[in-house]
Amino acid sequence: MTDESGGVHWHAQSVSRKDRETHNGHSGCVVWFTGLSGSGKSTIANLVDHKLHQAGIHTFLLDGDNVRHGLNATPSQLAKQYGEQFGKRFGLGFSEEDRQENIRRIGEVAGLFVEAGLIVLTAFVSPYQKDRDAVRSKLVEGDFIEVFVDTPLEICEQRDPKGLYRKARAGEIQGMTGIDDPYQAPMHPELVLDSGNIPADSCADGVLKYLRDMRKIAPSS
């Protein structure tokens, strides 16, 4: 086969995104929560998911830890079921290159959910601006809502729900974002949440207000 595309072509579907959004009663979009580990991304995203679900909005939450259990499993996780060679080839670790691929895959999945008319909530450290921008560039303008959960490192270390900062400070793990690997804060996020001073529930309400203001959901939602 000499075709550079590998014979892969996009298959048009008879049910369009607009059809699905009309059926759902709201627009699809990606709400991309980014911030340091322990900043409150997952907590706030989960609250937003719950509030939207209660309002009858069709959503799906993609969480960094959960995705690492399957789609973006580590080499050691895959090796247990498929063998070491398979794990090395397809598993994702935490190098800069692997983190880039982690976010690329998530962006592609999120884009598919948007085409289904869903509001996709993603909670990932996603430390590199170029990777977040790459996801944004694949979506229609206005569909990517970057939410910076702006929590100081000191507070994140105090929370340290997974014990990662303690391990990083002790030299037990390397490549910890905020310690020995950089976090590039968003330059122009659609929304900034001060999770260090504002309760998570109030932060979640701020996200819902933004979605209403942008007419992604109805004012009454």
PLM region spans:
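Glycine-rich phosphate-binding loop used to anchor ATP phosphates in small-molecule kinases
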Residues: G87-G142, Y165-R166
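Extreme N-terminal, non-catalytic leader segments
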Residues: M1-V30
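Conserved phosphate-donor/acceptor-positioning beta-strand/loop module used by diverse small-molecule
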Residues: L121-P127, L139-R159, L193
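The conserved Walker
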Residues: S37
